[in-house]
Amino acid sequence: MNESPAPHPLKQRLGGRNLYLVGMMASGKSSTGRPLAEQLSYGFVDTDAVIEQLAGQPIPKIFNEEGEEGFRAMESQVLNAIGQRHSLVVATGGGMVSKPENWGILHQGIVIWLNPGREELFRRLHADSGNRPLLQTEDPEAAFDCLFAERLPLYAEADLRVEVGAEEPDGIALKIIELLPQLLSPPVKMNG
């Protein structure tokens, strides 16, 4: 008979609070979120994947048909629904932080900013530019720099900032697990 592994000791201290991964596009939120959820015995949700599933089309097409404002409205609706659930690691879209009303939901959980830094982000995006609607311009680097400057102070509102480099997602997940206790109440000692 297979026994499931014991839950991570942090799971109880988290008290079911969702962990929201924020950061620029290509910062590794989805790839890090899966192993993080697995380590904590949490569920995993990618808001972009949920939006694509609900809309029945890929995000670039949603941007083309609905515009950024329409997409952001869908994103907020999805976040509202996710916020009703608990014990989730949530990979958010890069612009999730741009709507002030989203922060009310994000701050009900723990907000974790994955920050690879500008150069690494642009390198990753350059390799995947076709799937990034906000970079479909004459000068993608200038568009990126503008977005980066606009969003940086918003990401800085996160509860935890995690500098990431070339580590594998599993390693980044472990780094988050090592840093999370500084945000949590000490474990409760039970008598008896």
Swiss-Prot record:
GO terms for biological process: amino acid biosynthetic process; aromatic amino acid family biosynthetic process; chorismate biosynthetic process. One of its GO terms (molecular function) is shikimate kinase activity. PROSITE patterns: SHIKIMATE_KINASE. Keywords: Amino-acid biosynthesis, Aromatic amino acid biosynthesis, ATP-binding, Cytoplasm, Kinase, Magnesium, Metal-binding, Nucleotide-binding, Transferase. It comes from Prochlorococcus marinus (strain MIT 9303). HAMAP family: Shikimate_kinase. Monomer. This is Shikimate kinase.
